[in-house]
Amino acid sequence: GLAESIRAADSIHPIATHHMGGQAMAFPNDPNIRVFGQQTTKNTPEAMHDDAGKQGWGNWVYVMAEAHPWHKDLIDAELNNAAGRAPMRRSQWATAMAGGYVMMYDAFESGDPTDAMFDDLRRLKLFMEGTPFNRMAPLFDDALTTAKLDGTKYVLSNPAQGLYILYGDVNTGKLGVRNAPVGNYSLRWFDPVTGVTVNQSGSVVAGGLASFTKPAGVGPEA
């Protein structure tokens, strides 16, 4: 096939696919294609994380390339009445917490995203780059419901290594997770809206309930 021919001529660069027919990877068994740029028609952060995330996840790099027309509508809403930034940011975090990379779709059109929207995406990028996210996996469905505690909405985790990224989107007073290994933890609180970071320490005792109160200075998203 085409990907095989490209790989024969270029052994270095990753080969990606982006297709408009369906959200699931169309070439899951092609060893030459290792990047999937997904296009979805979902229009809520929850659906982006759940359905789009589960279909995008696999033995390849997962990139949320388009959420059309929702993301375009959010850009227009932000430009018209400052109503699109928050749902766009939550959508991007939902994708990241599903194991995906994020593109700012429609950035090349006449109605460009605002600087604040780009700043939100950069904060997400910098946060993830400061974590070992590549050693964690997203939780979905019953596994997510069983694990999350307090204001936690999405979870990336590697319990065997005691690694967790927890995200809460609205009025987050605490973040927590069940069945965490007993021990002492380094906590890094992060505000996706402002970039404020607070470092703390915490511990988990027998029973595995890890529940931590959000510190002052971090807003309702954390």
Annotate each predicted stretch with a short phrase:
Residues 1-116:
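Extracellular glycoside hydrolase catalytic/binding regions
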Residues 61, 70-73, 84-202, 209-222:
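Aromatic- and carboxylate-lined catalytic core of secreted/periplasmic carbohydrate-active enzymes
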